[in-house]
Amino acid sequence: MGIGLIVYVTIGLSCHSKACLQHFEEVIETTPEVTECHTITGAVEYLLRVEVTDIKSYKKFHTDVLGTIPSISSITSLLVMDTTKDLRVQV
């Protein structure tokens, strides 16, 4: 099965202690669907790039991974409909 769906996900946290941040990052580092994780400025703390086969797979990731991290206070999912330009190296 290939990648059929790319989702950019913003994550807001309710806890900003070192332990909360480390726990979030440890979970994300061990999750294969997450291909990028960026700490960002603004109203939320993280921006993730998630690559899955379909919307059903994304729902499973949303529930089984993000849904198990107690410090997450907000999740916004942005589904990529089409890509006009992508200069990243393709493997």
Outline where the language-model segments fall.
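A compositional/biophysical signature of low hydrophobicity enriched in polar/charged and small residues
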Residues: M1-V91
